[in-house]
Amino acid sequence: MAAKLTRLHSLRERLGATFSSHPNELIALFSRYVHQGKGMLQRHQLLAEFDALFDSDKEKYAPFEDILRAAQEAIVLPPWVALAIRPRPGVWDYIRVNVSELAVEELSVSEYLAFKEQLVDGQSNSNFVLELDFEPFNASFPRPSMSKSIGNGVQFLNRHLSSKLFQDKESLYPLLNFLKAHNYKGTTMMLNDRIQSLRGLQSSLRKAEEYLLSVPQDTPYSEFNHRFQELGLEKGWGDTAKRVLDTLHLLLDLLEAPDPANLEKFLGTIPMMFNVVILSPHGYFAQSNVLGYPDTGGQVVYILDQVRALENEMLLRIKQQGLDITPKILIVTRLLPDAAGTTCGQRLEKVIGTEHTDIIRVPFRNENGILRKWISRFDVWPYLETYTEDVSSEIMKEMQAKPDLIIGNYSDGNLVATLLAHKLGVTQCTIAHALEKTKYPNSDIYLDKFDSQYHFSCQFTADLIAMNHTDFIITSTFQEIAGSKDTVGQYESHIAFTLPGLYRVVHGIDVFDPKFNIVSPGADMSVYYPYTETDKRLTAFHPEIEELIYSDVENSEHKFVLKDKKKPIIFSMARLDRVKNMTGLVEMYGKNARLRELANLVIVAGDHGKESKDREEQAEFKKMYSLIDEYKLKGHIRWISAQMNRVRNGELYRYICDTKGAFVQPAFYEAFGLTVIESMTCGLPTIATCHGGPAEIIVDGVSGLHIDPYHSDKAADILVNFFDKCKADPSYWDEISQGGLQRIYEKYTWKLYSERLMTLTGVYGFWKYVSNLERRETRRYIEMFYALKYRSLASQVPLSFD
């Protein structure tokens, strides 16, 4: 007998049924929430009250506990408690409970946000409120629905294209037109005007196949170029007879029986990418002597490693396509006339290790002229529109052509990329690195507390504009998009939120959108390689490294002296800001006597040689000195100024390996974790935050260890346990070291990254062409939002003065 289908009950019905079954118990629980008064409760607070009340008899309340465990927050406005329920990544429901009347009601996103706003303004805002909703524009676009599909957008698109766009002969015409549209600076590629129909294309491909089977496989394309032109085929199919034949076979197979894997492979072989612009305006962007400066860290390293790998892949593919074209990559950043001893005042700078990649610097300016000094990434918003116009002129001058791909980095770079891509009609790729909304909890609802210092109203608006305008989004991890079972992803946090007094976002982004792709970076393996590769070790740096770590001298480069130089080293290196939580690591270490017995602490952060201009860094400096005094850490800690020499930093990781130490990354949230990748690539056992990217990079207990910086006592115990185990059994250190290396080789290399980026550009370029993925309606909506809201907000950010 067939199983009986039963109706899925709504969240309100399930909660109502639980109230009916256990009214007294649930009144007691919700009364506890209400008694805490008006405010917001986080998930752990909700569960703590539940555990305290029902610890002895949980099974009876299991259905309700499941609902509560899926709750991410509660808004308490007595006698009401509203819950934001997240049954799985990317899926949200909202309910409200009246504790006095035992009434349960479901809320729309808009109703929930309006209720939440009462935390700030104390009353329901009955006036008309601007609501931002991108959902109607995406209703006709294909999207997956399973959580496991999040971040695999290109695979989904390939399946969709294969099934829908090639369902009959007529639907193949966009592919024909796409191939005919290919040219570079007026030079035709792939197909010429001799081919006017699909039948003509197939006929030419068959004749070309017949010819290629009759010549040696290594015959260069130049020997049959003219023959192919007569058939309607131009350069771009390959450099040798074998490679051209392979490409022809891919297309013939697609025309016969479309297949997602073949489609991706074919689109990856088509010449589409010769000129690339990469935008990263803020901070000090240079190749040396800048790491550790304000707003200057992992993003700079990421981009420099990215362009080296990308140029190599572009050169390889152009050669394999049989083309004689010189690619060009431009990294666009801000020119700083007051360059603070760096090359940031230089307009053009060749990227070392490349042939065709330059850093081009364009200054910020306003009606008063060029801004000479560094300004915080939080203060750049009034300059970006003029900056975009200046950048557009500069890149056209340098490239003598429109770019084929524009990649934005971080909020400011992504906004400039959006404006440029919109103006030039170019494919856009977005890389967030970090979305500040996640790093600063409740910075949306309590915007007034943050906005004067951080200007988040501008930044969150810019982020929404960029993520909805872009053609595809690259993230380093799944967590960046949609979090985990228990934590909300960075992009996911932009699905629905409110900025009281400005606007409500009722549908800001869809994490199931096929524009999302996980493409993880690696470390530069010429700099970061295992400590066991002794023939490559840079031992010439060892005297300098020993001076840094162990000398008895205190100066502007290193503070405090280690007493016992034989202990293993707990090592950490990061910017000195609140989220990186370096002071939290020092406090964790200071509180645990056993940890101090087992290991020394060496941190690299900030600059003792000059006073920081960054507000947050100034506060962290004061806190660090205070903690060192409070826990009497002199003799146990070495605090080193930020180190600018990447090559020496690579050897520094390996030197820590020699002490049988460990790298600790204690951030409250880390979008990816380049230092985690670097340390693991050097073979240094790595213990990192469970919040963000490191939770995916490290397999806990196999390729490293996870710690929760919000529970510092437990985190310290994990470190103690690690060093105790290593002391009892030295092979345990080797086991974690090798596990980390294995993980890197499988998933985190720049070669894998650049191959994927090239393929994504091909697939999304094709998708954009054949399905009119200009998202014209969306972009008109974005134009209005930019003109009426963003520009107004940016004009309110105070201009900086030299």
From Swiss-Prot:
<keyword id="KW-0808">Transferase</keyword>
<protein>
    <recommendedName>
        <fullName>Sucrose synthase 1</fullName>
        <ecNumber>2.4.1.13</ecNumber>
    </recommendedName>
</protein>
<comment type="function">
    <text>Sucrose-cleaving enzyme that provides UDP-glucose and fructose for various metabolic pathways. Most active in the sink tissues where it is responsible for the breakdown of the arriving sucrose.</text>
</comment>
<dbReference type="GO" id="GO:0005985">
    <property type="term" value="P:sucrose metabolic process"/>
</dbReference>
<feature type="region of interest" description="GT-B glycosyltransferase">
    <location>
        <begin position="272"/>
        <end position="749"/>
    </location>
</feature>
<dbReference type="InterPro" id="IPR001296">
    <property type="entry name" value="Glyco_trans_1"/>
</dbReference>
<keyword id="KW-0328">Glycosyltransferase</keyword>
<dbReference type="Pfam" id="PF24861">
    <property type="entry name" value="SUS_N"/>
</dbReference>
<comment type="similarity">
    <text>Belongs to the glycosyltransferase 1 family. Plant sucrose synthase subfamily.</text>
</comment>
<dbReference type="InterPro" id="IPR056735">
    <property type="entry name" value="SUS_N"/>
</dbReference>
<dbReference type="GO" id="GO:0016157">
    <property type="term" value="F:sucrose synthase activity"/>
</dbReference>
<dbReference type="Pfam" id="PF24862">
    <property type="entry name" value="SUS_EPBD"/>
</dbReference>
<dbReference type="Pfam" id="PF00534">
    <property type="entry name" value="Glycos_transf_1"/>
</dbReference>
<dbReference type="InterPro" id="IPR056736">
    <property type="entry name" value="SUS_EPBD"/>
</dbReference>
<dbReference type="InterPro" id="IPR000368">
    <property type="entry name" value="Sucrose_synth_GT-B1"/>
</dbReference>
<dbReference type="GO" id="GO:0034059">
    <property type="term" value="P:response to anoxia"/>
</dbReference>
<dbReference type="InterPro" id="IPR012820">
    <property type="entry name" value="Sucrose_synthase_pln/cyn"/>
</dbReference>
<dbReference type="Pfam" id="PF00862">
    <property type="entry name" value="GT-B_Sucrose_synth"/>
</dbReference>
